[in-house]
Amino acid sequence: MSMPLDLYVIRHGESEANVIVQAGEQGDNSLYTQDNVTVPDRSWRLTATGRKQADCIGRWLVSQQQLFDRYMVSPYVRTRETAATMALPKAKWEENRVLRERSWGEINTITKDEFKNNYARNWNFKNTDPLYWRPRQASRLPMWPRTVCTTS
């Protein structure tokens, strides 16, 4: 397979998990409920804002009249929803699990303060060397793009 001439990488729209993390970063940890922290990462859905974002980028791509040879998406619900909401004509999406983002392990289910207090060394490493930092009990896969469109 030859290398693409152009590679478009599109991140999923805002997800329910993004809302929880953003609220926590602003000091509101009320969304870190037992129901929320037990949702598997792959199952988070888009919010209404996320669907609007996906629709917006989809309309823009269609307006560019760009045709793609391949359309790839991770198996996560939010990425598949983004792909579907973009409504790209003639797109046949291929699920590819290599495109999934890395797991954040147990850190995904705790607040920022809990992370700082319970894993101080790991917190410091994350802040001094974020490119090579890996969460405790997380996958070793690097961060990959969620949705990919290529042209040749």
Residue ranges, per PLM feature:
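An N-terminal RHG(E/S)-centered segment typical of histidine phosphatases
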Residues: 1-69, 81-84
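General small-molecule cofactor/ligand-binding pocket signal
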Residues: 8, 72, 94-96
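Phosphate-handling substructures
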Residues: 16, 20-41, 45, 87-150
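Short beta-strand scaffold positions
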Residues: 73-74, 146
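Cytochrome P450 catalytic-core helices
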Residues: 78
